[in-house]
Protein backbone atom coordinates (compact mmCIF):
# COMPACT_ATOMS: atom_id res chain seq x y z
CA UNK A 1 0.00 0.00 0.00
CA UNK A 2 1.26 3.46 -0.94
CA UNK A 3 1.44 6.27 1.61
CA UNK A 4 1.23 9.85 0.32
CA UNK A 5 1.46 13.10 2.30
CA UNK A 6 -0.27 16.31 1.20
CA UNK A 7 -1.19 19.70 2.58
CA UNK A 8 -4.64 20.56 1.20
CA UNK A 9 -8.04 21.37 2.66
CA UNK A 10 -9.90 18.21 3.68
CA UNK A 11 -13.17 19.53 2.33
CA UNK A 12 -11.70 19.86 -1.17
CA UNK A 13 -10.11 16.43 -1.67
CA UNK A 14 -11.42 13.94 -4.20
CA UNK A 15 -11.28 10.47 -2.69
CA UNK A 16 -13.24 7.29 -2.15
CA UNK A 17 -13.22 7.85 1.63
CA UNK A 18 -12.38 10.89 3.74
CA UNK A 19 -11.66 10.12 7.41
CA UNK A 20 -12.50 12.87 9.92
CA UNK A 21 -12.32 12.78 13.75
CA UNK A 22 -15.17 13.62 16.12
CA UNK A 23 -14.66 14.11 19.86
CA UNK A 24 -16.88 12.89 22.66
CA UNK A 25 -19.99 14.99 23.09
CA UNK A 26 -20.15 15.45 19.30
CA UNK A 27 -17.28 17.97 19.42
CA UNK A 28 -15.83 18.94 16.06
CA UNK A 29 -12.24 20.08 15.67
CA UNK A 30 -11.05 22.59 13.07
CA UNK A 31 -10.86 20.00 10.28
CA UNK A 32 -14.27 18.48 11.03
CA UNK A 33 -15.85 21.94 11.29
CA UNK A 34 -14.53 22.88 7.84
CA UNK A 35 -15.87 19.64 6.35
CA UNK A 36 -19.19 20.13 8.13
CA UNK A 37 -19.42 23.67 6.78
CA UNK A 38 -18.83 22.41 3.24
CA UNK A 39 -21.71 19.95 3.67
CA UNK A 40 -24.00 22.70 4.96
CA UNK A 41 -24.15 21.09 8.39
CA UNK A 42 -24.90 17.54 7.23
CA UNK A 43 -22.37 16.04 9.64
CA UNK A 44 -23.73 18.00 12.61
CA UNK A 45 -27.24 16.89 11.72
CA UNK A 46 -26.20 13.23 11.72
CA UNK A 47 -24.36 13.59 15.03
CA UNK A 48 -27.40 15.14 16.70
CA UNK A 49 -29.23 11.86 16.17
CA UNK A 50 -26.75 10.27 18.58
CA UNK A 51 -25.37 7.60 16.25
CA UNK A 52 -21.76 8.33 17.25
CA UNK A 53 -20.72 9.00 20.85
CA UNK A 54 -17.19 9.97 19.84
CA UNK A 55 -15.38 7.45 22.02
CA UNK A 56 -11.91 6.56 20.68
CA UNK A 57 -12.12 4.20 17.71
CA UNK A 58 -15.89 4.32 17.23
CA UNK A 59 -16.80 4.79 13.57
CA UNK A 60 -19.75 5.95 11.49
CA UNK A 61 -19.73 5.79 7.68
CA UNK A 62 -21.64 8.44 5.73
CA UNK A 63 -22.31 8.27 2.00
CA UNK A 64 -22.68 10.96 -0.67
CA UNK A 65 -22.64 14.05 1.53
CA UNK A 66 -23.41 17.28 -0.34
CA UNK A 67 -20.65 19.78 -1.06
CA UNK A 68 -17.79 17.27 -1.00
CA UNK A 69 -15.75 15.51 -3.68
CA UNK A 70 -15.31 12.56 -1.31
CA UNK A 71 -17.67 9.68 -2.05
CA UNK A 72 -17.79 8.70 1.62
CA UNK A 73 -16.96 10.31 4.94
CA UNK A 74 -15.83 8.05 7.76
CA UNK A 75 -16.27 9.68 11.15
CA UNK A 76 -14.01 8.26 13.84
CA UNK A 77 -14.34 8.95 17.55
CA UNK A 78 -11.30 10.65 19.08
CA UNK A 79 -12.42 10.70 22.71
CA UNK A 80 -12.29 13.53 25.21
CA UNK A 81 -10.24 16.67 24.87
CA UNK A 82 -7.09 15.20 26.42
CA UNK A 83 -4.41 13.62 24.25
CA UNK A 84 -4.58 9.91 23.45
CA UNK A 85 -1.89 7.50 24.63
CA UNK A 86 0.06 5.37 22.17
CA UNK A 87 -2.17 2.34 22.73
CA UNK A 88 -5.42 4.27 22.22
CA UNK A 89 -3.97 5.95 19.11
CA UNK A 90 -2.96 2.62 17.60
CA UNK A 91 -6.42 1.18 18.35
CA UNK A 92 -8.09 4.18 16.70
CA UNK A 93 -5.94 3.82 13.58
CA UNK A 94 -6.55 0.06 13.47
CA UNK A 95 -10.30 0.68 13.77
CA UNK A 96 -10.19 3.04 10.79
CA UNK A 97 -8.09 0.57 8.80
CA UNK A 98 -10.57 -2.20 9.55
CA UNK A 99 -13.44 -0.19 8.08
CA UNK A 100 -11.41 0.88 5.04
CA UNK A 101 -10.49 -2.73 4.25
CA UNK A 102 -14.17 -3.60 4.04
CA UNK A 103 -14.93 -0.89 1.50
CA UNK A 104 -14.51 -1.04 -2.25
CA UNK A 105 -12.58 2.22 -2.50
CA UNK A 106 -9.07 2.21 -3.93
CA UNK A 107 -7.92 5.18 -1.88
CA UNK A 108 -8.60 7.04 1.35
CA UNK A 109 -7.61 10.38 2.84
CA UNK A 110 -6.94 10.70 6.57
CA UNK A 111 -7.52 14.18 8.02
CA UNK A 112 -6.48 13.54 11.62
CA UNK A 113 -4.46 16.64 12.47
CA UNK A 114 -6.92 17.57 15.23
CA UNK A 115 -6.04 14.50 17.31
CA UNK A 116 -3.22 14.93 19.83
CA UNK A 117 -1.12 11.99 21.05
CA UNK A 118 0.57 12.36 24.42
CA UNK A 119 4.38 12.47 24.48
CA UNK A 120 4.50 12.66 20.68
CA UNK A 121 4.94 15.74 18.55
CA UNK A 122 2.06 16.66 16.25
CA UNK A 123 3.91 15.68 13.09
CA UNK A 124 6.73 13.13 13.04
CA UNK A 125 6.00 11.20 16.22
CA UNK A 126 2.24 10.95 15.84
CA UNK A 127 2.23 10.14 12.14
CA UNK A 128 5.05 7.63 12.27
CA UNK A 129 3.07 5.56 14.75
CA UNK A 130 -0.02 5.93 12.55
CA UNK A 131 1.83 4.89 9.40
CA UNK A 132 3.48 1.88 11.05
CA UNK A 133 0.11 0.72 12.37
CA UNK A 134 -1.48 1.01 8.93
CA UNK A 135 1.34 -0.75 7.10
CA UNK A 136 1.87 -3.52 9.63
CA UNK A 137 -1.87 -4.18 9.53
CA UNK A 138 -1.57 -4.96 5.82
CA UNK A 139 0.60 -8.01 6.50
CA UNK A 140 -0.75 -11.35 5.26
CA UNK A 141 1.08 -14.69 5.25
CA UNK A 142 -0.74 -17.09 2.95
CA UNK A 143 2.16 -18.61 1.03
CA UNK A 144 1.08 -22.15 1.87
CA UNK A 145 -2.68 -21.64 1.52
CA UNK A 146 -4.25 -23.11 -1.61
CA UNK A 147 -6.80 -20.28 -1.44
CA UNK A 148 -5.01 -16.95 -1.26
CA UNK A 149 -6.42 -13.87 0.44
CA UNK A 150 -8.53 -11.68 -1.83
CA UNK A 151 -6.59 -8.68 -3.19
CA UNK A 152 -7.58 -5.58 -1.25
CA UNK A 153 -9.20 -2.70 -3.07
CA UNK A 154 -7.37 -0.10 -0.96
CA UNK A 155 -4.10 0.80 -2.70
CA UNK A 156 -3.27 4.29 -1.45
CA UNK A 157 -3.73 6.31 1.73
CA UNK A 158 -3.09 10.05 1.80
CA UNK A 159 -2.19 11.71 5.08
CA UNK A 160 -3.23 15.36 5.30
CA UNK A 161 -0.82 17.58 7.22
CA UNK A 162 -0.54 21.31 7.76
CA UNK A 163 2.14 23.09 5.73
CA UNK A 164 4.36 23.64 8.75
CA UNK A 165 4.57 19.92 9.43
CA UNK A 166 4.57 18.58 5.88
CA UNK A 167 8.28 17.72 5.73
CA UNK A 168 8.20 15.96 9.10
CA UNK A 169 5.13 13.90 8.21
CA UNK A 170 6.80 12.90 4.92
CA UNK A 171 9.86 11.82 6.91
CA UNK A 172 7.63 9.86 9.28
CA UNK A 173 5.96 8.06 6.37
CA UNK A 174 9.34 7.23 4.81
CA UNK A 175 10.73 5.83 8.06
CA UNK A 176 7.53 3.91 8.80
CA UNK A 177 7.55 2.36 5.34
CA UNK A 178 11.13 1.13 5.79
CA UNK A 179 10.38 -0.26 9.25
CA UNK A 180 7.22 -1.98 8.02
CA UNK A 181 9.21 -3.54 5.16
CA UNK A 182 11.74 -4.85 7.66
CA UNK A 183 9.03 -6.16 9.97
CA UNK A 184 7.28 -7.96 7.11
CA UNK A 185 10.55 -9.64 6.10
CA UNK A 186 11.14 -10.67 9.72
CA UNK A 187 7.61 -12.05 10.00
CA UNK A 188 7.92 -13.96 6.73
CA UNK A 189 11.10 -15.68 7.90
CA UNK A 190 9.61 -16.47 11.30
CA UNK A 191 6.39 -17.87 9.86
CA UNK A 192 8.11 -20.19 7.39
CA UNK A 193 7.99 -23.89 8.33
CA UNK A 194 11.24 -25.35 9.65
CA UNK A 195 11.49 -27.94 6.88
CA UNK A 196 12.11 -25.00 4.52
CA UNK A 197 13.65 -22.36 6.78
CA UNK A 198 16.87 -24.01 7.96
CA UNK A 199 20.36 -22.49 8.36
CA UNK A 200 21.25 -22.92 4.68
CA UNK A 201 18.00 -21.21 3.66
CA UNK A 202 18.86 -18.20 5.83
CA UNK A 203 22.31 -18.14 4.23
CA UNK A 204 20.66 -18.02 0.79
CA UNK A 205 18.47 -15.13 1.94
CA UNK A 206 21.60 -13.25 2.97
CA UNK A 207 23.18 -13.86 -0.44
CA UNK A 208 20.02 -12.65 -2.20
CA UNK A 209 20.09 -9.49 -0.09
CA UNK A 210 23.72 -9.00 -1.09
CA UNK A 211 22.84 -9.32 -4.78
CA UNK A 212 20.09 -6.73 -4.42
CA UNK A 213 22.37 -4.26 -2.60
CA UNK A 214 25.80 -4.05 -4.19
CA UNK A 215 27.39 -2.27 -1.24
CA UNK A 216 26.48 -5.09 1.15
CA UNK A 217 29.27 -7.57 1.87
CA UNK A 218 28.03 -11.08 2.66
CA UNK A 219 30.05 -13.97 4.09
CA UNK A 220 28.69 -17.42 4.92
CA UNK A 221 30.79 -19.81 7.02
CA UNK A 222 30.00 -23.52 6.83
CA UNK A 223 30.41 -26.07 9.62
CA UNK A 224 34.09 -26.68 8.76
CA UNK A 225 34.88 -22.97 9.01
CA UNK A 226 32.90 -22.71 12.25
CA UNK A 227 34.99 -25.54 13.68
CA UNK A 228 38.24 -24.08 12.32
CA UNK A 229 37.45 -20.76 14.02
CA UNK A 230 37.33 -22.61 17.33
CA UNK A 231 33.61 -22.05 17.84
CA UNK A 232 33.16 -25.22 19.86
CA UNK A 233 29.96 -24.10 21.59
CA UNK A 234 28.26 -23.03 18.36
CA UNK A 235 29.35 -26.21 16.57
CA UNK A 236 28.06 -28.41 19.40
CA UNK A 237 24.49 -27.13 19.03
CA UNK A 238 24.14 -28.17 15.39
CA UNK A 239 26.01 -31.47 15.42
CA UNK A 240 22.86 -33.55 16.06
CA UNK A 241 21.06 -32.26 12.97
CA UNK A 242 21.14 -33.27 9.32
CA UNK A 243 20.94 -29.52 8.59
CA UNK A 244 24.46 -28.07 9.03
CA UNK A 245 25.00 -24.81 10.96
CA UNK A 246 25.87 -21.56 9.26
CA UNK A 247 27.49 -18.36 10.52
CA UNK A 248 26.29 -15.45 8.37
CA UNK A 249 28.08 -12.09 8.42
CA UNK A 250 26.71 -9.06 6.57
CA UNK A 251 28.58 -5.75 6.47
CA UNK A 252 26.94 -2.47 5.45
CA UNK A 253 29.08 0.64 5.02
CA UNK A 254 27.03 3.82 5.03
CA UNK A 255 29.66 5.99 6.73
CA UNK A 256 33.42 6.48 6.45
CA UNK A 257 35.39 3.24 6.50
CA UNK A 258 37.20 4.48 9.60
CA UNK A 259 33.95 4.86 11.58
CA UNK A 260 33.46 2.07 14.08
CA UNK A 261 30.44 -0.09 13.25
CA UNK A 262 27.44 -1.07 15.30
CA UNK A 263 27.04 -4.83 15.50
CA UNK A 264 23.78 -6.78 15.73
CA UNK A 265 24.05 -10.45 16.67
CA UNK A 266 21.01 -12.67 16.08
CA UNK A 267 20.21 -16.09 17.47
CA UNK A 268 19.09 -18.24 14.54
CA UNK A 269 17.95 -21.60 15.89
CA UNK A 270 15.70 -22.59 13.01
CA UNK A 271 14.07 -25.35 15.04
CA UNK A 272 14.63 -26.17 18.70
CA UNK A 273 13.61 -29.59 19.95
CA UNK A 274 15.76 -29.06 23.03
CA UNK A 275 18.17 -31.69 21.74
CA UNK A 276 18.84 -34.60 24.11
CA UNK A 277 17.20 -32.48 26.85
CA UNK A 278 14.02 -32.87 24.83
CA UNK A 279 11.18 -30.37 25.12
CA UNK A 280 7.57 -31.51 25.74
CA UNK A 281 5.67 -32.20 22.51
CA UNK A 282 2.80 -29.78 23.13
CA UNK A 283 3.45 -26.50 21.36
CA UNK A 284 6.80 -27.62 19.97
CA UNK A 285 5.73 -26.43 16.51
CA UNK A 286 6.30 -22.89 17.78
CA UNK A 287 9.99 -23.62 18.19
CA UNK A 288 10.34 -22.64 14.54
CA UNK A 289 10.25 -19.12 15.99
CA UNK A 290 13.54 -19.69 17.83
CA UNK A 291 15.28 -17.98 14.92
CA UNK A 292 13.36 -14.72 15.35
CA UNK A 293 16.42 -12.98 16.77
CA UNK A 294 18.25 -13.59 13.50
CA UNK A 295 15.10 -12.73 11.55
CA UNK A 296 14.81 -9.38 13.35
CA UNK A 297 18.43 -8.58 12.50
CA UNK A 298 17.63 -9.32 8.84
CA UNK A 299 14.58 -7.05 9.08
CA UNK A 300 16.49 -4.22 10.71
CA UNK A 301 19.16 -4.45 8.03
CA UNK A 302 16.43 -4.23 5.37
CA UNK A 303 15.17 -1.01 6.97
CA UNK A 304 18.69 0.43 7.19
CA UNK A 305 19.35 -0.40 3.53
CA UNK A 306 16.09 1.23 2.44
CA UNK A 307 16.83 4.38 4.45
CA UNK A 308 20.52 4.43 3.42
CA UNK A 309 21.51 5.39 6.97
CA UNK A 310 24.95 7.03 7.28
CA UNK A 311 26.32 4.43 9.70
CA UNK A 312 28.42 1.29 9.48
CA UNK A 313 26.58 -1.85 10.53
CA UNK A 314 27.67 -5.47 10.92
CA UNK A 315 25.06 -8.22 11.29
CA UNK A 316 26.14 -11.62 12.62
CA UNK A 317 23.63 -14.47 12.47
CA UNK A 318 24.43 -17.67 14.33
CA UNK A 319 22.18 -20.28 12.71
CA UNK A 320 21.74 -23.92 13.67
CA UNK A 321 19.07 -26.57 14.23
CA UNK A 322 18.97 -28.22 17.67
CA UNK A 323 18.02 -31.88 17.17
CA UNK A 324 18.53 -35.14 19.08
CA UNK A 325 20.47 -37.94 17.41
CA UNK A 326 23.39 -40.28 17.95
CA UNK A 327 25.69 -37.37 17.07
CA UNK A 328 23.97 -34.82 19.30
CA UNK A 329 25.63 -33.07 22.21
CA UNK A 330 24.95 -34.77 25.56
CA UNK A 331 24.26 -33.21 28.96
CA UNK A 332 27.64 -33.27 30.69
CA UNK A 333 29.69 -32.60 27.55
CA UNK A 334 32.37 -29.92 27.86
CA UNK A 335 33.22 -27.70 24.88
CA UNK A 336 35.82 -25.02 24.27
CA UNK A 337 34.52 -21.70 22.97
CA UNK A 338 36.23 -19.35 20.53
CA UNK A 339 37.27 -17.20 23.51
CA UNK A 340 39.12 -20.16 25.05
CA UNK A 341 36.66 -20.48 27.94
CA UNK A 342 35.28 -23.96 28.53
CA UNK A 343 31.57 -24.66 29.03
CA UNK A 344 29.92 -27.62 30.72
CA UNK A 345 26.65 -28.24 28.87
CA UNK A 346 24.26 -29.32 31.61
CA UNK A 347 21.14 -28.79 29.50
CA UNK A 348 21.15 -29.03 25.71
CA UNK A 349 17.94 -26.95 25.64
CA UNK A 350 19.97 -23.94 26.78
CA UNK A 351 21.50 -23.81 23.32
CA UNK A 352 20.89 -20.20 22.30
CA UNK A 353 23.60 -18.88 24.59
CA UNK A 354 26.01 -21.45 23.11
CA UNK A 355 25.68 -20.16 19.55
CA UNK A 356 25.64 -16.55 20.74
CA UNK A 357 28.75 -16.73 22.90
CA UNK A 358 30.97 -17.63 19.95
CA UNK A 359 29.27 -15.03 17.75
CA UNK A 360 29.92 -12.39 20.43
CA UNK A 361 33.59 -13.34 20.50
CA UNK A 362 33.72 -13.11 16.71
CA UNK A 363 32.26 -9.58 16.93
CA UNK A 364 35.43 -8.33 18.67
CA UNK A 365 37.34 -8.23 15.37
CA UNK A 366 35.15 -5.37 14.11
CA UNK A 367 36.18 -3.06 17.00
CA UNK A 368 32.53 -2.01 17.39
CA UNK A 369 30.96 1.08 18.92
CA UNK A 370 28.36 -1.20 20.47
CA UNK A 371 27.13 -4.78 20.16
CA UNK A 372 23.49 -5.78 20.65
CA UNK A 373 22.46 -9.41 20.63
CA UNK A 374 18.83 -10.34 20.01
CA UNK A 375 17.48 -13.74 21.02
CA UNK A 376 14.39 -15.70 21.96
CA UNK A 377 16.53 -16.88 24.83
CA UNK A 378 14.54 -17.79 27.95
CA UNK A 379 11.06 -18.88 28.93
CA UNK A 380 11.84 -17.13 32.21
CA UNK A 381 11.58 -13.80 30.40
CA UNK A 382 7.99 -14.61 29.43
CA UNK A 383 7.22 -15.45 33.06
CA UNK A 384 8.79 -12.19 34.25
CA UNK A 385 7.59 -9.73 31.60
CA UNK A 386 4.87 -11.44 29.57
CA UNK A 387 4.49 -10.53 25.92
CA UNK A 388 4.40 -6.74 26.08
CA UNK A 389 8.05 -5.89 26.57
CA UNK A 390 11.45 -7.39 25.81
CA UNK A 391 14.00 -8.01 28.54
CA UNK A 392 17.11 -5.82 28.36
CA UNK A 393 20.44 -6.35 30.09
CA UNK A 394 23.95 -5.14 29.40
CA UNK A 395 27.28 -3.82 30.62
CA UNK A 396 26.96 -0.13 29.66
CA UNK A 397 24.40 2.24 31.19
CA UNK A 398 24.51 4.71 28.30
CA UNK A 399 23.77 1.99 25.74
CA UNK A 400 20.97 0.59 27.90
CA UNK A 401 19.46 4.08 28.21
CA UNK A 402 19.63 4.62 24.45
CA UNK A 403 17.82 1.34 23.79
CA UNK A 404 15.15 2.02 26.41
CA UNK A 405 14.54 5.46 24.89
CA UNK A 406 14.40 4.02 21.36
CA UNK A 407 11.88 1.44 22.52
CA UNK A 408 9.61 4.09 24.04
CA UNK A 409 9.67 6.26 20.94
CA UNK A 410 9.13 3.32 18.60
CA UNK A 411 6.38 1.92 20.86
CA UNK A 412 8.39 -1.31 20.97
CA UNK A 413 9.39 -1.29 24.58
CA UNK A 414 12.10 -3.02 26.56
CA UNK A 415 12.57 -3.30 30.32
CA UNK A 416 15.92 -3.42 32.07
CA UNK A 417 16.76 -6.32 34.37
CA UNK A 418 19.81 -6.36 36.68
CA UNK A 419 23.13 -7.97 35.88
CA UNK A 420 24.62 -8.07 39.37
CA UNK A 421 27.83 -10.02 39.99
CA UNK A 422 26.07 -12.16 42.60
CA UNK A 423 24.12 -13.92 39.84
CA UNK A 424 27.35 -15.06 38.18
CA UNK A 425 27.95 -17.57 40.97
CA UNK A 426 24.96 -19.62 39.78
CA UNK A 427 26.97 -20.51 36.65
CA UNK A 428 29.89 -22.07 38.52
CA UNK A 429 30.92 -25.53 37.31
CA UNK A 430 33.20 -27.98 39.15
CA UNK A 431 34.54 -29.27 35.83
CA UNK A 432 34.69 -26.30 33.41
CA UNK A 433 35.04 -22.53 33.46
CA UNK A 434 31.29 -22.07 33.27
CA UNK A 435 28.05 -24.07 33.19
CA UNK A 436 25.47 -23.28 30.52
CA UNK A 437 22.59 -23.05 33.02
CA UNK A 438 22.32 -21.44 36.44
CA UNK A 439 19.47 -23.31 38.08
CA UNK A 440 15.78 -22.42 38.34
CA UNK A 441 16.14 -18.91 39.77
CA UNK A 442 16.51 -15.73 37.68
CA UNK A 443 16.81 -17.63 34.40
CA UNK A 444 16.79 -14.56 32.15
CA UNK A 445 19.46 -12.88 34.24
CA UNK A 446 21.77 -15.88 34.48
CA UNK A 447 21.49 -16.42 30.71
CA UNK A 448 22.63 -12.83 30.21
CA UNK A 449 25.37 -13.36 32.81
CA UNK A 450 26.63 -16.25 30.69
CA UNK A 451 26.74 -14.03 27.59
CA UNK A 452 28.40 -11.17 29.49
CA UNK A 453 31.52 -13.30 29.94
CA UNK A 454 32.02 -13.19 26.18
CA UNK A 455 31.26 -9.47 25.75
CA UNK A 456 33.87 -7.79 27.93
CA UNK A 457 35.76 -6.16 25.05
CA UNK A 458 33.01 -3.68 24.09
CA UNK A 459 29.77 -1.98 25.09
CA UNK A 460 27.14 -4.70 24.95
CA UNK A 461 23.41 -5.15 25.40
CA UNK A 462 21.21 -8.23 25.26
CA UNK A 463 17.55 -8.21 24.18
CA UNK A 464 15.57 -11.27 25.27
CA UNK A 465 12.57 -11.33 22.91
CA UNK A 466 11.14 -14.71 23.95
CA UNK A 467 7.85 -13.07 24.91
CA UNK A 468 7.56 -10.53 22.10
CA UNK A 469 8.80 -12.27 18.93
CA UNK A 470 5.61 -14.20 18.18
CA UNK A 471 1.99 -14.63 19.23
CA UNK A 472 1.04 -18.13 20.38
CA UNK A 473 -2.10 -19.97 19.28
CA UNK A 474 -5.40 -18.61 17.97
CA UNK A 475 -6.18 -16.74 14.77
CA UNK A 476 -3.44 -14.17 15.42
CA UNK A 477 -0.71 -16.79 15.79
CA UNK A 478 2.50 -15.79 14.07
CA UNK A 479 5.68 -13.75 14.16
CA UNK A 480 5.32 -10.11 15.23
CA UNK A 481 8.32 -8.48 13.57
CA UNK A 482 9.59 -7.14 16.89
CA UNK A 483 12.06 -5.70 17.83
CA UNK A 484 12.69 -4.24 14.35
CA UNK A 485 11.08 -0.88 15.33
CA UNK A 486 13.24 -0.58 18.46
CA UNK A 487 16.47 -1.51 16.69
CA UNK A 488 15.79 0.72 13.69
CA UNK A 489 14.96 3.64 15.98
CA UNK A 490 18.20 3.08 17.87
CA UNK A 491 20.18 3.19 14.62
CA UNK A 492 18.21 6.22 13.35
CA UNK A 493 19.18 8.00 16.56
CA UNK A 494 22.84 7.09 16.13
CA UNK A 495 22.75 8.22 12.49
CA UNK A 496 21.51 11.66 13.53
CA UNK A 497 23.73 12.00 16.62
From Swiss-Prot:
Enzyme Commission no: 3.4.11.1, 3.4.11.10
Intracellular or extracellular location(s): Cytoplasm
Cofactor entry: Mn(2+)
Active site per database record: 279, 353
EC category: hydrolase
Entry keyword set: Aminopeptidase, Cytoplasm, Hydrolase, Manganese, Metal-binding, Protease
Protein name: Probable cytosol aminopeptidase
Amino acid sequence: MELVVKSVAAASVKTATLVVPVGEGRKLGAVAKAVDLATDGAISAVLKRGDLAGKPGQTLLLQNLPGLKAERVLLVGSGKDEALGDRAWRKLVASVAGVLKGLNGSDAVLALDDIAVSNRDAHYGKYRLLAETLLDGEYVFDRFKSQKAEPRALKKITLLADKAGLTEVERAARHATAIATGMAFTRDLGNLPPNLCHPSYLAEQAKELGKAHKGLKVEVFDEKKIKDLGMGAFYAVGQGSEQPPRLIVLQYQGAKKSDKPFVLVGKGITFDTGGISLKPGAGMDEMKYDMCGAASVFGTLRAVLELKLPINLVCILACAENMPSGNATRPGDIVTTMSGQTVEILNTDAEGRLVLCDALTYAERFKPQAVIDIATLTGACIVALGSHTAGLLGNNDELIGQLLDAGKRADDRAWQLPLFDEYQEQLDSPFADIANIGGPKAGTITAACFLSRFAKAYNWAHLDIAGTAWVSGGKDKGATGRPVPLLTQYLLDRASA
